[in-house]
A protein has these predicted regions:
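N-terminal positively charged helical leader segments and presequences
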Residues: 1-68
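A generic structural signal for short beta-strands and their flanking turns/coil linkers
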Residues: 13, 33-35, 45-47, 57-59, ...
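Glycine/charged-rich beta-loop-alpha catalytic/anionic-binding loops adjacent to active sites
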Residues: 15-17, 74-78, 190-194, 212-221
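Hydrophobic side chains in well-ordered alpha-helices
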Residues: 25, 89-92, 207
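RNA substrate-binding interface of SAM-dependent RNA methyltransferases
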Residues: 70-167
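Active-site/ligand-binding-proximal alpha/beta "capping" segment
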Residues: 159-208, 216-220
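Structured adenosyl-cofactor binding patch, chiefly the S-adenosyl-L-methionine
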Residues: 205-247
Length: 247
C-alpha cells in the first residue's frame, strides 16, 4: 500500500511536500523518482502522486485527478470529553481518529480530577497525535483538537451548532438507535453529531440538567460502568455502526 501524506500544495497536476514529511519520504523511506504515494489535501480528497523531483526539504510530484476519500464517514462527529488524568486523553484522540471522529473538544467540569496546566503546549501534542493517527489509519481529513473549555457551561453554550447532541450519563437515557433514526441534518448534508462524555468523576446532577436545557439528548451506555477513556470510544463505535460506517 502506498504511503500517505497531507499537503495543501496541490494544483494543476502538480504537488509539493515540505518539512518533516518531505524529510521522512526522501531520507527515511528513501523515496525514488517514479515512486507512487497517496496525497491528501485535508478536505477528504485524495490524489495518486508520482515523485518527479527532490529539493532541500521538499519533494515534488505529478498528480492524477483527485477522488473522494473512502475513509471518511457519512456523519460528522465531535467528541466533547471531560478532561481525564494522565495520558487518557491521548488514547481517546488516537483511537477516536481511527474510528472516524472529526473534532475533539476537552472540557473541565465539576468532578474533573485533572486541573488546567500548560494547555497550549499540550494542545500542540494532541493535534500532532491526531495528525499521525489520521495518516496511519488512512483518513482524508485532518481531525482537530481544540483547547479545553473552562467549564460545563461553556460546553452547553456551544451545542447549538449540532444536529444531534448525545449526553452520555450513567443514570441512563433514550436508546441510541432511536435518537439516530430521528435526527436529520440541518444543511441536508452530513449529520453533525456531538457526543459528550465525562471525566473520572462523571457529571453532577446540575450538569445533566444544564445539558438537557441546552438541547442534549441523554443516552445510557448499558448496565456497566465504563471508564472515562472507554466510554467515548464505545459511543463512537456504536454511532458508526448504527449509521453504516463500520460495514
Amino acid at each position: 500500500m502506498p504511503h500517505r501524506y497531507f499537503t495543501t500544495e496541490i494544483s494543476d497536476g502538480t504537488a509539493v511536500l515540505r518539512g518533516a514529511d518531505a524529510h521522512h519520504l526522501s531520507r527515511v523511506m528513501r523515496g525514488r523518482l517514479g515512486d507512487t504515494v497517496i496525497l491528501c489535501d485535508g478536505s477528504a480528497v485524495e490524489y495518486t502522486a508520482t515523485i518527479t523531483g527532490f529539493g532541500d526539504e521538499t519533494v515534488e510530484f505529478s498528480v492524477e485527478p483527485g477522488y473522494p476519500s473512502a475513509a471518511e464517514p457519512t456523519v460528522d462527529v465531535t467528541l466533547l470529553v471531560g478532561y481525564p488524568k494522565q495520558d487518557k486523553l491521548e488514547q481517546v484522540i488516537r483511537h477516536g481518529v481511527e474510528l472516524g471522529c472529526d473534532h475533539f473538544v476537552p472540557f473541565f467540569s465539576r468532578y474533573c480530577v485533572a486541573a488546567p496546566k500548560k494547555e497550549e503546549q499540550k494542545n500542540e501534542r494532541y493535534n500532532r497525535i491526531a495528525f499521525e493517527a489520521a495518516k496511519q489509519c488512512g483518513r482524508g481529513i485532518l481531525p482537530d483538537v481544540a483547547l479545553p473549555l473552562p467549564n460545563f457551561g461553556a460546553v452547553c453554550r456551544s451545542l447549538d451548532q449540532y444536529d444531534l447532541v448525545l449526553f452520555c450519563y450513567e443514570c441512563g437515557g433514550a436508546p441510541l438507535r432511536q435518537l439516530l433514526a430521528e435526527a436529520t441534518p440541518a444543511d441536508g448534508k452530513k449529520l453533525k453529531i456531538a457526543i459528550i462524555t465525562g471525566a473520572e468523576g462523571g457529571f453532577a446532577a446540575e450538569e445533566a440538567e444544564m445539558a438537557a436545557k441546552a438541547g442534549a439528548k441523554t443516552v445510557g451506555l448499558g448496565p456497566r460502568i465504563l471508564r472515562c477513556e472507554t466510554a467515548p470510544l464505545a459511543v463512537v463505535s456504536a454511532v458508526m455502526t448504527l449509521t453504516g460506517n463500520l460495514e
